[in-house]
């Protein structure tokens, strides 16, 4: 299987999100990379499903709560930018204040 660098990166983010979701299910609070991975994966998968950029910008800020993260993580992440493939092409989605 020959994957492009972009495809490898998408797989790595997806795998990191899976690990983070498993930790969250066990009651472990998320660190910075885990929180980013879960939100990024949510946006990428939402784009594949055909959701709009505006919808993902809003919904992406509701994926993780402050209580699910280690102390100070919410304040560290001001925005997350994800390049996602939509049915009509690739677009940049920015989620502002993603952990509330």
Curated annotation (Swiss-Prot):
Metabolic or biological pathway, per its Swiss-Prot or TrEMBL entry: Nitrogen metabolism; urea degradation; CO(2) and NH(3) from urea (urease route): step 1/1
UniProt cross-references to InterPro entries, sorted A to Z: Urease_gamma (IPR012010), Urease_gamma/gamma-beta_su (IPR002026), Urease_gamma_sf (IPR036463), Urease_subunit (IPR050069)
Keywords: Cytoplasm, Hydrolase
NCBIfam families: PRK13241.1, urease_gam
Protein name: Urease subunit gamma
EC number: 3.5.1.5
GO cellular component: cytoplasm
Single GO term (MF): urease activity
Principal localisation: cytoplasm
Name of the top EC class for this enzyme: hydrolase
Subunit composition and interactions: Heterotrimer of UreA (gamma), UreB (beta) and UreC (alpha) subunits. Three heterotrimers associate to form the active enzyme.
Gene giving rise to this polypeptide: ureA
Family: Belongs to the urease gamma subunit family.
Record carries keyword Hydrolase: yes
GO biological process: urea catabolic process
């Amino acid at each position: 299987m020959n994957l492009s660098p972009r495809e490898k990166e998408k797989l790595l983010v997806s795998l990191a999100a899976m690990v983070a979701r498993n930790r969250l299910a066990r009651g472990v609070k998320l660190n910075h990379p885990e929180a980013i991975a879960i939100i990024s994966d949510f946006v990428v998968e939402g784009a594949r499903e055909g959701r709009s950029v505006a919808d993902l910008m809003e919904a992406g800020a509701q994926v993780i709560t402050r209580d699910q993260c280690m102390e100070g993580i919410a304040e560290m992440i001001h925005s997350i930018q994800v390049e996602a493939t939509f049915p009509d092409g690739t677009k940049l989605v920015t989620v502002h204040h993603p952990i509330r």
